[in-house]
Amino acid sequence: LSRCSKSPNRGDPFSAAKVGLRALDGVRLTVRKGTSLAVVGESGSGKSTLLRVLLGLDRPTGGRALYHSKPILEGRASGIAFARDVAMVYQDARGSLDPRMTIGALIAEPLRHFDIVPRQDEAARVAQLLDRVGLPADAADRYPSGLSGGQVRRVAIARALASEPSVLVADEAVSGLDVSTQAQLLILLQSLQRDMGLTLIFITHDLGVASFLCEEIAIMYLGRIVETGPTDAVLGAPSHPYSAALRAAAPQFFEPLSEPLPGEIPSPLNLPAGCRFSTRCPKAQDDCRLKDPQLGKLGPQRAVACLHPLQPQ
């Protein structure tokens, strides 16, 4: 993404575009091939809009969204190739599956759409995909309603893998599950990413999940990325006060819960002057309320949007 911004469609009578709302505001983000990236932030931070732009479901109103240095979905042929190469695992996995279709038919659908294998080889390919995600071959004859929450997530992953993608995008793919099922799915995603050489983009609000699964992390606040870098480095020694606040809010064994951030999240329709985190930042100084910090390099692998980055202790 190159300085991507996204405002509501002006043709929408309920749009807030007239008052300057930007769900994304000048976002710069590069995902390297074969790596895993976690996008983390509170509700309303812009994660969902970022996801839609990454998938080509929304076009940015400013800046560019590129895939292999070419604009996403430019032309019909490239759009079909992009849809095959970039697969999605939705947060509502059960809702993404047609309840009237068997699991086998659901997984076979992208095989046919993208002409992956001959029709006579579909059943064998479906069985391979089910095995890859840890489900028995006879699951192909069942319906989504007969599966548990964890099994449905595995089916959604198998269906995403059917098109033989290079990039797998997962939106809160383990949320709402018990801890043991979450752990099993995270281990599955980790092994798939490693064994298949996938590029993984994982949207989450859970820092523990991000730390376990992803090599790199991007932290969002009110439509902007405020810090990026290797996950261990960012979570081990955050440079942005918001990153530090998120880490402090995550439950830790044998440690008392930290005090929540003061104040309320500003309305995106009425952003504060200067740094948009200044109204809640415990480290804010006078210039933070005047200058709007941009994402800038902080060492060879990290970047932060802060006038006074935190220093490692």
What are the residue ranges of the model-derived segments?
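Charged, flexible cofactor/metal-binding loops and thiol motifs
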Residues: R10-S15, G20, P230-Q313
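Conserved ABC ATPase "signature" region
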Residues: D121-D138, R247
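Helix-to-loop junction immediately C-terminal to a conserved catalytic motif
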Residues: L55
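Conserved ABC ATPase signature
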Residues: Y143-L147, Q151
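A short, proline-enriched helix->beta-strand linker immediately N-terminal to the Walker B motif
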Residues: A162-S166
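P-loop NTP-binding/switch modules centered on Walker-like glycine-rich loops
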Residues: L177-E259
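ABC ATPase NBD coupling module
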Residues: P13-K18, I72-A87, A105, H113, ...
